[in-house]
Amino acid sequence: MSPMLATLPDVTAVLHSPSASPPSGLRAPAAVGMGMARTRFLAPRAAASAASAVSAKPAAVAPLYADRTVVRIGLPSKGRMSEQTLSLLKSCQLSVRHLNPRQYTADIPQVPNLEVWFQRPKDIVRKLQSGDLDLGIVGFDIVSEYGQGSDDLVVVHDALEFGHCRLSLAVPKEGIFENINTLEDLANMPEWTQERPLRVVTGFGYLGEKFMRENGFNHVSFLAGDGALESYPAMGMADVIVDLVSSGTTLRENNLKEIDGGVVLESQATLVACRRSLHKRNGVLEITHEMLERLEAHLTATGEIMVTANMRGNSAEEVAERVLSQTSLCGLQGPTISPVYRSRDGKVAVEYYAINVVVPQKSLYKSIQQLRSIGGSGVLVTKLTYIFDEETPRWRKLLSELGL
């Protein structure tokens, strides 16, 4: 808090303290109505007199985008999202060193000058927008809801392969919704009027309202909810819900169903950056590049297997022709084939060729069968940790978006 702003809590304390009556000339705070807070402003003279009563020394206002040398990344502070984030970073040789679990800060020894801050996901997005964080790992649903299309946010990697879910609209299975199976069916129901709008409960007010508006719903009211939204229709508090869905089991167990066209957003974990930081803060672009390369190399290697085998042949070209005739042995850019040297009668001879090819783990057995069918033997299987490309396409895309 800057010195100048230090007077504000004292004024607020005077206004909001239950035991204190408002100073002369000041109005008491207005009550908060459903869904909308109404704010009344203090008259200039009254505000000035209240501030003078507190007496504060004038001080310089700190810049909103304060200079600092350390780069900050925000990570989820708790829950499964936090565990999966730390696990992914560890797999990329970016282990987070968190010495005191009571503290909100940590570091990554492999990346000097990078400071880790554990935050609530929505606070990560807000602090990226303000410039208090430079990078963050957070679900795309949270980025979309709290970022609200802000140009201050740049999605660096949009598919970190965990935290998968969808923001979806669900309706009751019975009653007036029994035959409602599409979004169009729901919009065309005659029940919704200006006097009796469709009542939607959601924790995603921005995305929910935007979705309903873009899909032609004219008579809709929104109720903010947080947790156990599935109970609202059964209790008569709402007609439908817009909530995060993973497997859909919770919806089914509460007699709700998704409808065609009702998916608002597909989401998973993403790496997000503050645009201003990428442009202005020293070290942010370089650290972003390193993290992106590590993440991309590891995620590309996930699910891929290196298969090595020996095969008799008269030449590397002949062996290559046999290997490439098999659909599952094409590799990333093609198989690598090299001679296997043996000593025969005191001379070096080549009778076998070694084949190295990357195949999807899910088709491993099929690949081994195909290798055997063309003469492969001594098959070795190696799990891959990283596959570094010449340059990740996401990095080129980021530079293009930044105009660099």
UniProtKB/Swiss-Prot annotation:
Keywords: Amino-acid biosynthesis, Chloroplast, Glycosyltransferase, Histidine biosynthesis, Plastid, Transferase, Transit peptide. Transmembrane segments: none annotated. One of its GO terms (molecular function) is magnesium ion binding. It comes from Oryza sativa subsp. japonica. CDD domains: PBP2_HisGL3 (cd13593). Pfam families: HisG, HisG_C. Catalyzes the condensation of ATP and 5-phosphoribose 1-diphosphate to form N'-(5'-phosphoribosyl)-ATP (PR-ATP). It comes from the Eukaryota. Its main location: plastid. Pathway: Amino-acid biosynthesis; L-histidine biosynthesis; L-histidine from 5-phospho-alpha-D-ribose 1-diphosphate: step 1/9. Residues 1-72 form a transit peptide. It catalyses: 1-(5-phospho-beta-D-ribosyl)-ATP + diphosphate = 5-phospho-alpha-D-ribose 1-diphosphate + ATP. GO terms for biological process: L-histidine biosynthetic process. This is ATP phosphoribosyltransferase, chloroplastic. One of its GO terms (cellular component) is chloroplast. It is found in: Plastid, Chloroplast. InterPro entries: ATP-PRT_HisG_long, ATP_PRibTrfase_cat, ATP_PRibTrfase_CS, ATP_PRibTrfase_HisG, HisG_C, N-reg_PII-like_a/b, N-reg_PII/ATP_PRibTrfase_C. Its EC number is 2.4.2.17. Belongs to the ATP phosphoribosyltransferase family. Long subfamily. Feedback inhibited by histidine. Its cofactor is Mg(2+).
